[in-house]
């Protein structure tokens, strides 16, 4: 009986450990309970939450307090990996320079967050939210939720030289930045990137060689209005999130990359 009881205890303990959300930050692991119990954990109210599209209040920790010193000049990016394959490349300067203040919001298992709009899951257990995001022009794709890890990385173009714009057009150069911010979290381009939600937009054929420019613009704005399928993940980018000038720049960049 002691053996059976011991085995049952181990099984329950293992289940409890497995059920405890854990986030990796630059190779160090933090449990949700550990983060919620920190002395610097505070309540944050976000008036216009990007993911929930309404006011939300969270308990979280200032993100800067959790980050170790950067590893070198080229490690100027914070790579945020989510459990669904979304991978945001957030400029470290955006996190550290002031203005907008990033927090790591932590979902309390005893008080779970509501499900995201049109989803069955919440944004938890870990979610990067911003106080005063307008102060630093924080973009929608820089609010990664369902986080699995945060780590320092090289800037995307240094890490993947094939992302460099092929065009001398300044608009295309601006489009490169738009692509890295909005598209790279889910897509790759000629093998560059680690996002796994959508297809590679450069190979085996560049996207603008099989989709017309008007078609691409329509997909970016309202993908469900162009085509739908059961596993569709992409939602549209309205003009508030992606202004027309940024969409023009993105198209110019992808045109140059298709040559």
Label each residue range with its predicted role.
Residues 175-190, 216, 234, 250-254:
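The canonical Cys-X-X-Cys-His
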Residues 62, 179-185, 190, 197, ...:
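Short pre-active-site segment immediately N-terminal to redox-active cysteine/selenocysteine motifs
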Residues 1-8:
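Bacterial N-terminal signal peptides that target proteins for export
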Residues 190-221:
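Gly/Gly-Pro-rich "capping" loops immediately C-terminal to redox-active cysteine motifs
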Residues 19-156, 259:
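Structured, non-membrane catalytic/scaffold regions adjacent to prosthetic-group chemistry
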Residues 196-202, 222-251, 257:
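Axial heme c-ligation environment in periplasmic c-type cytochrome domains
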Residues 154-178:
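Electrostatic cytochrome c docking/interface patches
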Residues 11-16:
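N-terminal signal peptide c-region/cleavage motif recognized by signal peptidases
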């Amino acid at each position: 009986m002691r053996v059976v009881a011991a085995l049952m205890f181990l099984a329950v303990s293992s289940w409890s450990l497995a059920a405890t959300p854990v986030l990796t930050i630059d190779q160090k692991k933090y449990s949700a309970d550990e983060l919620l119990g920190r002395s610097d954990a505070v309540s944050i109210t976000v008036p216009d939450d990007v993911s929930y599209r309404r006011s939300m209040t969270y308990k979280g920790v200032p993100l800067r307090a959790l980050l170790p010193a950067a590893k070198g000049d080229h490690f100027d990016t914070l790579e945020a990996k989510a459990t669904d394959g979304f991978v945001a490349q957030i400029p470290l300067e955006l996190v550290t320079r002031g203005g907008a203040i990033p927090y790591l919001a932590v979902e309390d298992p005893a008080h779970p967050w509501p499900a995201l709009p049109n989803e069955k899951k919440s944004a938890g257990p870990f979610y990067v939210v911003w106080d005063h995001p307008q102060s630093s022009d924080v973009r929608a794709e820089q609010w990664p939720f369902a986080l699995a890890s945060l780590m320092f990385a090289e800037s995307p173009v240094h890490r993947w030289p094939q992302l460099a714009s092929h065009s001398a057009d300044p608009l295309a150069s601006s489009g490169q930045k738009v692509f890295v911010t909005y598209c790279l979290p889910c897509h790759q381009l000629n093998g560059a990137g680690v996002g796994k939600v959508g297809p590679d937009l450069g190979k085996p054929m560049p996207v603008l060689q099989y989709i017309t420019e008007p078609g691409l613009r329509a997909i970016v704005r309202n993908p469900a209005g162009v085509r739908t399928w059961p596993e569709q993940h992409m939602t549209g980018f309205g003009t508030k999130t992606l202004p027309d000038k940024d969409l023009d720049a993105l198209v110019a960049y992808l045109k140059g990359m298709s040559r």
